[in-house]
């Protein structure tokens, strides 16, 4: 009888551990970014978690092996110094202001903010991982010096992190730099700072700018071939280029730019003249963040161009009323999509 009871008890424990293990794995895989949130606020940070109690408990000692995780509030206090926090937390994480002193001791007085001068590397002040307080983000954080995503408070996290359900939420940035390596939208008031095509070529990922300033620093079509990801669009239409899940295609008009302007890529030394009157239609191919194809005809028939888009660095753009031209990386001719 004792032997049967022992076997039954062990079986129950094993099944419980297996369920917890599977649940923990599923939960951490559902987290899109790398960050720590308090257990009580998880449903505010990750919309897909409707019940924060389902989040797995993790020990501080195991955080280094688990990049995507959720920490309970009592564990946050054990992350005492910024160097340890930056090692344990791989990149992005979110903490409430009440826990600020436990994560970054330099900012124990959360109301006593400091200004970081443009010529003063912010990384020396906050060790790359730091907390920003909502509207004050642009005041004391120098974007062109910091090359990692920063921490924000729960109430303002949507300004920094693209939410799970709203794929068109982005953050604003103030400086053109190669250090900014995430997708963003430029505010109209900041657009004049981007004055040369070479500045846009430094940006590693996809971005959007107001249409009436675009011609000052990016050559449409040409730039979208050369930049690693997709092309320039007006800020008000940015959600049409990155549509929410469930939307197949959107049409947008990119305003007229200076006609017959010749642009030179600083690396490939390729010169092409384009008429900058574009109509685009995009279709989500593989998720929201990467591959798009052009729709043809009058927007109702979805078609992909006859080439491997991997050969042209993901996305490319061509004028809708232009002759056939060449994509340098592809080394072949492609027709301009008609919409």
Curated annotation (Swiss-Prot):
The keyword Signal belongs to this UniProt entry's keyword annotation: yes
Key words, A-Z: Signal
Signal peptide coordinates: 1-26
Cellular component per GO, a single term: cell surface
Cellular localization per UniProt: Cell surface
Main location group: other
Signal is among the record's keywords: yes
Role summary: Adhesin that binds to the host cell extracellular matrix proteins fibronectin, fibrinogen, collagen, and vitronectin.
Protein name as it appears in the record: Extracellular matrix protein-binding protein emp
